[in-house]
């Protein structure tokens, strides 16, 4: 069931979104050669809790960390451990913060030092596809309009959208209805309504769209070992278009 948020709930989601965005800005300053993923995770945890929130991902369905940190060919759900970053890595931080019962959810792909031109273009197209999609995030459109715009922008650039994992509603639960695929047909799907809150999250692969889950039962990787990028924000549908809740 899709939950329409009232003004009080929206205010709490704005605060959760600010904390989420702040944690990602902190993560961007920490991504450097020689830094461990577990250090980045611990600093994200410290930031979220110091702002009166709790990490949405910690122990969610058994996930063992406060942030998902995925490197290079890892698409999503990377578990931060002792791995040290190296020059040229691309690092996706996916962060959620729960403030007074409401969640923010966002992700960014961050460069570790100087990266390849291919990596830069992949990140740029992924980020652009989010903004192409939310051009249709208003009550005159349907979910399929967002999904189609994302897919079209990505595939026109020669990249692939991941289809096994999708965006979602967000609110008092980290994952709510509806699902928001990054592919689809314009004019189809659920009608958008004022007060809906959605996590729109293009996951884009440099090569094949095919992915697999590692033996840890969490980390998703590209089947061809090529790079993957991820860009996500929580948004609010308003009469005048989308309000992005997870950008400072």
Named regions from a protein language model:
Residues 1-248:
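Active-site neighborhoods and metal-handling regions in enzymes and metal-associated proteins
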């Amino acid at each position: 069931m899709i939950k329409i948020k009232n003004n009080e709930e929206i205010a709490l989601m704005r605060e959760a979104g600010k904390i989420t965005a702040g944690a990602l800005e902190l993560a961007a300053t920490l991504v450097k050669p020689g830094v461990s993923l577990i250090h980045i995770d611990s600093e994200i945890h410290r930031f979220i809790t110091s702002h009166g929130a709790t990490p949405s991902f910690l122990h969610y369905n058994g996930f063992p960390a406060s942030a998902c940190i995925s490197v290079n060919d890892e698409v999503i759900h990377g578990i931060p451990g002792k791995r040290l970053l190296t020059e040229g890595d691309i690092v996706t931080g996916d962060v959620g913060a729960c403030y007074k019962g409401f969640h923010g959810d966002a992700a960014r792909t961050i460069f570790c030092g100087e990266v390849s031109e291919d990596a830069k273009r992949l990140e740029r197209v992924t980020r652009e596809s989010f903004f192409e999609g939310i051009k249709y995030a208003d009550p005159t459109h349907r979910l399929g309009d967002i999904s189609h715009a994302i897919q079209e922008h990505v595939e026109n650039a020669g990249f692939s959208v991941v289809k096994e994992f999708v965006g979602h509603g967000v609110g008092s639960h980290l994952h709510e209805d509806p699902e928001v695929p990054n592919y689809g047909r314009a004019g189809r799907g659920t009608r958008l309504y004022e007060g809906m809150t959605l996590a729109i999250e293009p996951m884009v692969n440099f090569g094949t769209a095919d992915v697999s889950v590692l033996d840890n039962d969490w980390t998703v990787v590209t089947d061809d070992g090529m790079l993957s990028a991820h860009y996500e924000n929580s948004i609010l549908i308003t009469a005048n278009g989308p309000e992005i809740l997870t950008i400072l």
